[in-house]
Amino acid sequence: MYESLQQMQEICETENKAFWELVMEEEANEKQNSYEEVFEMMRSMYRAMVQADENYDDRRSASQMTGGAGELMAKWNRDEKTLSGPFLGQVMERALKMAESNACMKRIVAAPTAGSCGVLPAVMITYQKLEKCPEDEIVKALFVAAGIGQIIASRASIAGAQGGCQAEIGSASAMTAGALVFLRGGSLQQIYEATALALKGLLGLVCDPVAGLVEVPCVKRNVIGAVNAVSCSDMAMAEITSFIPVDQVIDAMDEIGRNMPCQYKETSQGGLAVTPAGKSVVL
């Protein structure tokens, strides 16, 4: 287990390895599998994401709070009404669809959590489809995301109950930003800059699920995490940097999470959950 992204960068430079290779090798050693087996396991994760996207339907959740937003966004995209263009339009659509599928208890891939399951797939699937990216490159990008997520989990948290929504949507957005920079041919330093920028932008985000369900505001926050990742990848590719190094940003998230009142950490005792509309939900 590596202790920091800085440590991983130093190893990559010393051993002349790509970041994704380092992550894959660690996973193979831990599971006692071959590199090929681990690579194919990750491919199966990506294909499960694609299948979840393709199997979306616009049914509403059991609570009736969510459902159908993904199809509404799809129609908006088909009508070419979005100001954000085809890429971001499809990213938003897929993020909604994946998160709504989770709310309806359908099969998804936690990335890193079920509540943030729409962020990484939305960007990866859209990139593959619109940029005609080979599947193998997407799989490598998922290893990049996994390596970033591993460090966030070890230095801070990826659980809303421990660190608030910054730990879920924030982590997913950071992982996705780094993975996208990799796909776009950015350097490891640019991957780290995108990761830091994405996480910084979502620091302090609380976890305040209405009625204790992973629906409101969780579904639509997946869109925010995905769009944030894309914008931060653009900034990093433009050579814009984070004044605070990535490992220190992760540590800041941990500090914020530790000091965040418990009513903002998945207890449904604060924020949107205790608004009149939030308290009106009867299950």
Task: Name the predicted role of every residue range.
Residues 182-283:
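Functionally critical mobile loop/hinge segments
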Residues 83, 110-117, 127-129, 133-134, ...:
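Glycine- and small hydrophobic-enriched segments that form the cores of compact globular domains
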Residues 143-175, 179, 202-228:
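A structural-propensity feature for long, helix-poor, extended segments
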Residues 1-106, 130, 239, 246-283:
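Generic N-terminal targeting/processing segments that precede catalytic cores or assembly contacts
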Residues 121-132, 180-185:
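Alpha-helical support elements that line or immediately flank enzyme active sites
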Residues 105-123, 167-172:
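Conserved phosphate/anionic-ligand binding catalytic regions in large, soluble enzymes, centered on
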Residues 82, 111-114, 136, 160-168, ...:
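Alpha-helix capping and helix-loop boundary segments enriched in small/acidic/polar residues
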Residues 85-102, 137-156, 201-209, 244:
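Acidic-glycine-rich active-site phosphate/pyrophosphate-binding loop
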